[in-house]
Amino acid sequence: VNRRPIGYYIHHHGAGHRARADAIAAASEWPVTLMGTGIGAAGVDLPDDRLEIEFDGADGTDCRPLAFHYAPIGHSGVRERTARIAGWIAEMRPALMVVDVSVEVALLARLASVPTVYVRLNGDRTDPAHLEAFRSASALLAPYHAQLELPSTPEWVRRKTRYLPGITAPGRRRNSARGRVLVVFGRGGSPGAGDVLARAAAACPDWEWRAIGPVTAPSLPISNLTLSGWTDRPECEIAEASIVVGAAGDGLVSAVLAADKPFICIPQERPFGEQVATARGLAAAGAARVLSLWPEAAHWPGLLAEALTLKAGARRALHVENGPLIAASWLAELAAAFRAQRECTA
């Protein structure tokens, strides 16, 4: 059977979008073409659309339509990016476009007569641009459990959404010989403060502390603290931990739930309150100990003891095994259904 590809657009801010796309593509029997800035030979590499290296989402224009979030004027990268996506659609005639995430790309694909699945992140996304992207999509994919949904999300959006938690690398459920705290810092925010981390480790001498991701070097070395830098396989580090500390991005939350680890969650500020919404849902479910700020060093011994008392059943209820395969199979079903519709109306 000639299967036209599923196009999968990946936003370039942070690492979670790419990790989710890679997991789904690897599990898919239907051909998937990844596209995004920095994709390289793995798919369709798109020109960068950022005004500055330090991207803050602002486009510097005062005449942006309400249906857009980011539409700078006079930017060659945006023009070339749009042309490349439209050209690929015209040439490959994709069965479906998954957009993770960009309201502009979602509307572009829809305007090009392609059915879309929009990846809907958590948070209050009731602004006009998000609602139009949701309305234009044939379906919505939420990479988290429905129990974490904000109460303010419109009912029609919920009905259109397929909740697919567990889109992550398979969890490895084992513990290190010694109690280990793993602190995870992602690419979507500022580097971790090494001195603050060192003080926390010093306050808990019976624990081995380990950090992955970008962290500044502490002023003085601490014997029970190891900074391991960036890793492409965070699930391996998570598997060796007794407790995980980190923010509330979908990628990390999914990986921690997959590994069934006690979680101390410190959400970071993100547009539309994404991480705060997820953290509140985790706290309400009893699946994590949630803090609004990094605590003083003296509080860490008690927090670690408290994390160990969290009930495993609460976090297990928010996870689904084989998430990438379930997501890939669902997308393939949609692609096949849309192809059948086109054949019937041809």
Language model regions located:
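Conserved nucleotide-sugar phosphate-binding/catalytic loop shared by glycosyltransferases and other
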Residues: 3, 11-12, 27-80
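A short, glycine/small-residue-rich beta-strand->loop->alpha-helix junction that serves as a flexible
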Residues: 9-22, 189-192
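Donor-nucleotide binding loops and adjacent catalytic segments primarily
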Residues: 25, 169, 176-243, 293
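Conserved nucleotide-sugar donor-binding subdomain of glycosyltransferases
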Residues: 65-106
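A donor-sugar binding/catalytic signature common to diverse glycosyltransferases
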Residues: 96-101, 234-277
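Active-site-proximal region of nucleotide-activated glycan assembly enzymes
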Residues: 114-171
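Nucleotide-sugar donor-binding patch of glycosyltransferase catalytic domains
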Residues: 262-306
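C-terminal amphipathic helix plus adjacent low-complexity
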Residues: 302-346
